[in-house]
Regions:
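ATP-dependent adenylate-handling active sites, centered on carboxylate activation for C-N bond formation
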Residues: 1-156, 161-166, 173, 178-215
Length: 215
């Protein structure tokens, strides 16, 4: 088994909504339970910066900066020992592990919950392009279009209906970005990444289990 960590991360780690604590505790639990031959791939900040261009080439366009380059370097290191791997990618999407499944401001945001700050993103556009592109209008259109496809049961509570909407958006938008990232960063290194949590049979089953049984 393999995991990634960063030099001085133990000294400088600061919790966020996405990562309230270090992964190391849970990695140790996994390794102890499964008794695996575990390897930690250590990366440093200069490495991440240097790999940004390769990560952009792998994706064919600018992507998620160090989120991409860290994945690219991780795959490069693991490729020294194997050509195929299983990952936990998509578990949070399938089982509702992200903070936006629980935070009221995200559930009631009226937009894609992982990108609520639309005006800040608009400022990243070239001023000439920004004059021609109404980013919020386009996002609102795609958001409402996506919600038309959400399958709701007659027995669903109001809370369950809202979480179904969030799940649908996460599976069809956010998860697709991560799958594309994994595939491109892996194959750039000749490394195949498989995602068992994304098995359609598991996804279909988990869609209808009670939320209390999810994350």
């Amino acid at each position: 088994t393999y995991s990634v960590d960063y030099i001085d991360n133990d000294k400088n780690f600061q919790k966020t909504d996405f990562q309230p604590n270090s992964d190391n505790y849970y990695i140790d639990l996994m390794q102890s339970k499964l008794n695996t031959n575990h390897h930690v791939v250590m990366l440093d900040t200069p490495e991440l910066a240097k790999a940004l261009e390769d990560a952009m080439i792998a994706r064919d366009f600018p992507g998620m900066a160090d989120v991409d380059s860290s994945m690219l370097l991780f795959c490069k290191n693991v490729k020294n020992d194997a050509t195929v791997t299983l990952t936990g990618e998509c578990a949070d999407e399938i089982f509702g592990g992200y903070p936006w499944f629980f935070r009221e401001d995200a559930l009631n945001s009226g937009t894609f919950p992982w990108s609520i700050a639309i005006s800040e993103r608009q400022q990243l556009l070239n001023p000439e392009i920004a004059k021609k592109v109404n980013l919020k209008e386009y996002i609102d259109y795609r958001y409402n279009e996506s919600l038309e496809d959400v399958e709701i049961l007659d027995t669903d509570t109001d809370e369950t209906k809202e979480k179904r909407k969030i799940s649908h958006l996460t599976l069809n938008w956010f998860m697709q970005t991560l799958l594309d990232r994994s595939d491109r960063m892996g194959m750039y290194n000749g490394f195949e990444i498989r995602v068992p949590f994304c098995d359609y049979r598991l996804a279909e089953y988990v869609w209808n289990i009670p939320w209390e049984m999810k994350a």
